[in-house]
């Protein structure tokens, strides 16, 4: 294994291609589980035995809905209550040429037959010893689970989109955490990757934004073009408000603005979002060319309902970061790949970015955009939002001089 904790997605895909396993973890900064993953096409008694002997978790087969439908393999329960939203189906055994179904040989046969187009639904006994998992359409871009990571990885490796996964446990039966997984990887010469990096890889290498329509947009700030984009995975709509000719222009003035219904529409004084949007539109309207992106990522990515729940916690004394964490969210869940692809579709590669947020700069640059200059977009604090802005400066690193 290389002398670093996390391998590249490219290295992991190479391993999958030659039939090796990789370890996939939820998040490097959290105490979450790691799963062994390999391609279902590479299922063998040796692979199954390794998983049962060394990983010790439940062996499952993530796969696409279409194949499960062909085999008439239904969900295990009609209304799952499992908190991570993992979609288990009924367990199965392949009936032909197997015995009890539990041996490494029998389970490897069942895995291979699940993806064999000649195998029919009547060839499988229910229940059994292999647990198919229904992958969410869109893979890790739709759900950041091991199920989706497995299907994405094997697809990238050129195999049929189905994998084998098994949680890794310690000798004493406890779940293996990050330090344990690093030792496990070194012992067995395996690469470790994160689901987050797989998400980033797909967003960098695949197109998932499509232009739907563009229209003239006369406003109090000037005459613009409004370009509507659709996220092909989530079906969310995002807007680009464009001034002048921006295609192939250098250092275009850009604001990437996340939606804030309370601030942008109802002029809430809890935040500076509405004022920032108006200031950005005014600046772009006065420029020769520019763009304001309006991204559907309410509440820094947690959605309107959760944002309002966070407001309730703030009314009880928490700040915006503490409230997010109390609800189980990171302080900022926004995905800048959406904005980067919208700018790319508009033919823009270098920008002057209106922002106070260093995370936004890093996020956009990670997708290949050149940020020539940062243009501050600071709004004077009010009594209602002073604590909010102070928290953004002290806990989120925002570059604010007036707070």
Swiss-Prot record:
Protein name per UniProt: Riboflavin biosynthesis protein RibBA
Binding site for Mg(2+) 1: 31
Gene3D superfamilies associated with the record: DHBP synthase, GTP cyclohydrolase II
HAMAP family in the record: RibA, RibB, RibBA
Binding site for Mg(2+) 2: 31, 146
Positions annotated to bind GTP: 255-259, 276, 298-300, 320, 355, 360
Stated role: Catalyzes the conversion of D-ribulose 5-phosphate to formate and 3,4-dihydroxy-2-butanone 4-phosphate.
InterPro entries: DHBP_synth_RibB-like_a/b_dom (IPR017945), DHBP_synthase_RibB (IPR000422), GTP_cyclohydro_II (IPR032677), RibA (IPR000926), RibA-like_sf (IPR036144), Riboflavin_synth_RibBA (IPR016299)
Gene: ribBA
Pfam families per UniProt: DHBP_synthase, GTP_cyclohydro2
Region of interest called GTP cyclohydrolase II, as start-end residue ranges on this chain: 205-403
GO biological process: riboflavin biosynthetic process
Binding-site list for D-ribulose 5-phosphate: 30-31, 35, 143-147, 167
Region annotation DHBP synthase: where it falls in the sequence: 1-204
